[in-house]
């Protein structure tokens, strides 16, 4: 019962920043609890980044973000080795993906080589630079956004990368009532500042372990 109440409390906090879109928020939280990654396909400006930030605050997750463009390099994601003159050694400089919740914004604007830099982290929970593998912090969640197919400057994500995402969601345009509420919140100072922490990283891991213990019958598994 405790885990269920914590999940409801997390959603309550995220709703302070995101107006409406309850079904999307519930599914996104389910994906996080199921140790999955999320792909958001939508037009710009509908609240995808706000949602990711709100979840990171409510779950007390270290947040990282990269705005993907054609000139973003794989090393920007995974990190790189830099020569230190004072020690005479190569030292690892962590990339943006070394965090708990990584927002890959407009992922399909990046080159295929840069897109693939996320694959190892998403599938194996580690990055490899210069032959040395380093684990990403746990828990680890990727929320990637992509513009709709055919949008200017985009390219299709490969199937190998799409397979790393548990859910593919779309927020869509806000309704007139939701737009009015957004204006009210902006006028009176609501939004991200009102989001409070519900659990820490250890608490999230306990929630995930509770999900792992849920019994699934053979009939459901073979569906």
List each language-model region with its residue ranges.
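Phosphate-binding P-loop
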Residues: 29-35, 43, 94-97, 134-136
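Dynamic helix-loop-helix/coil hinge segments at AAA+ ATPase domain boundaries and subdomain interfaces
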Residues: 1-24, 213-215
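Walker A/P-loop
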Residues: 32-69
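The conserved Walker
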Residues: 17, 44, 107
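Canonical AAA+ ATPase core
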Residues: 84-89, 110, 114, 122-214
């Amino acid at each position: 019962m405790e885990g269920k109440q914590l999940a409801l409390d997390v959603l309550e906090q995220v709703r302070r920043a995101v107006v409406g879109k309850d079904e999307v928020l519930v599914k996104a939280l389910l994906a996080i609890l199921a140790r999955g990654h999320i792909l958001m396909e939508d037009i710009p400006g509908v609240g995808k980044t706000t949602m990711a930030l709100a979840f990171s605050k409510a779950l007390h997750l270290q947040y990282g973000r990269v705005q993907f463009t054609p000139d973003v390099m794989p090393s920007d994601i995974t990190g790189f080795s830099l020569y230190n003159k004072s020690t005479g050694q190569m030292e690892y400089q962590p990339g943006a993906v070394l965090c708990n919740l990584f927002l890959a914004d407009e992922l399909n604007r990046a080159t295929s080589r840069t897109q693939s830099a996320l694959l190892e982290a998403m599938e194996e929970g580690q990055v490899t630079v210069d032959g040395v593998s380093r684990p990403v912090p746990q828990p680890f969640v990727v929320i990637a956004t992509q513009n709709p197919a055919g949008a200017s400057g985009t390219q299709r994500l490969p199937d190998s990368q799409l397979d790393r995402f548990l859910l593919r969601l779309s927020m869509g345009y806000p309704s007139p009532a939701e737009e009015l509420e957004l204006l009210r919140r902006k006028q009176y100072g609501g939004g991200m500042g009102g989001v409070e922490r519900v659990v820490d990283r250890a608490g999230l891991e306990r929630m995930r372990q509770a999900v792992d213990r849920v019994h699934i019958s053979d009939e459901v598994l073979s569906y």
